Amino acid sequence: MAIFENIEKFLEWRDLCSDVIGYHQAVMLTSGGFDPLHVGHLRCIQETVKMANNPKKFPSANRPLVTVLVNCDDFLKAKKGYNFMSLEDRMEIIHGIAGVDCVLPWFYTNDDFTVTKAIHRIRPRWFTKGGDRTDATNIPEWEICQQVGCEVITGVGGKKIRSSSELVENADRFNLEAVELAGWAAGYGEGKDSY
């Protein structure tokens, strides 16, 4: 459906839709840095969509909005020291995944590396976490989810099979090897000059 520039715009849009359809559509939320997006992220998002599309649980009129909250570049830089892909690119790619309704950024504030404030404002009915999270009570957002009546669903998309940090490290190692190979091919590896 849409990429929103912030949570406020999303909430305004949701309220407007509620006025038109006569009820407040529930939100099924998932979140992450998705930097870079990998198959584990994809499976978590696809499984979240599959849950939302379950006709036994949600008749088509009551299907929740599949909403993906994406951590901003500053959040990633503060947490892991870098961002690999821009927020805009990550949001657009996620928006292209079939069944995703809304994509919104989460902006880093006050050394808080959680999305608890976002959950407090959005008040989703469900919050899904990927395969590396198996104990709902052991996530930082557990308490706020309990306060707002949000069910936490863990292990979504299967077991953890990739790490964004690992992918970036592999890309860095590949680039270094390419530079070393180029230097060797130019004769720098034979003691002519250093590079």
For the regions a protein language model found, what residue spans apply to each?
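Nucleotidyltransferase catalytic core that binds NTPs
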Residues: 1-195
